[in-house]
Amino acid sequence: FNLLVKLNQRNPEVQNYHFDTIRFWVDEFDIDGIRLDAADVLDFDFMRGLRRVANEVKPEFWLMGEVIHGDYSRWANPEMLHSVTNYELHKGLWSGHNDHNYFEIAHTMRRLQGLCHDTRLYNFSDNHDVERLPNKLRNRDHIRHIALLVYTLWGIPSIYYGSEFGIEGKKEWGSDWPLRPCLELTDYTDAEKTNPVTSIYAALGSLKAECPELSWGEFKELTLTTQSYAYARVLDGKAIVAVYNNGDSPVSMEFQLPVEASGVEDLL
């Protein structure tokens, strides 16, 4: 990151300047959190200091960092950041569908749970730095599969503006600007009724708000093949089960429900 300003993050004056900045924004504007760009080059003790100040000024204040590679628990833990960008899952979401290989997504979830435990990572399908899903998927119908995964896997779902409309965005000549277009919302007034991508995002947003299982429920894998995947989010004797088929024809799946039940309900 040669273009970034180099600050001595161990200098007390530098630290206090940033600590006071958090205090100012909370006192003046009651902000709820900040995103730390390129958090993987920040000093760990500096981030510990940020967390201490955040806890002091507003217990629910949220610190999220941009981290691409590595063991995410080094940055996201009870002493430093609350969460980091989940690029590892992001890669599996689109390539796992292109390759018809749900093992990639399942393996990623197992690995991240082993490393990060209860920490909820910042899950996304696309953002301002990566090409949008319609330009990466071989089958654009899989956009809806990925939306469901982002909302129901363990973590915090993040929707990049325009993704709820399924817009395209491909890097050109090394520039990210095609990923960041200006949208006129008046062009999408009826999108929830006419656009299947928008309708699934709207339904998932409502489901997330109504069902605490999707925020706090234990994640349990139920069955897995290259083309089919099922898991549950379980909380207080209730379970939400998500079932996927990335193939071109129907499949049959058998698995044990994670809770006792007399029936099931289709939530979407």
Where do the protein language model's features map onto the residues?
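Short, acidic/polar
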Residues: R10-E28, H142-A147
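Structural recognition of the beta-strand scaffold that forms the well-ordered cores
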Residues: G33-R35, W62-G65, Y122-F124, Y151-T152, ...
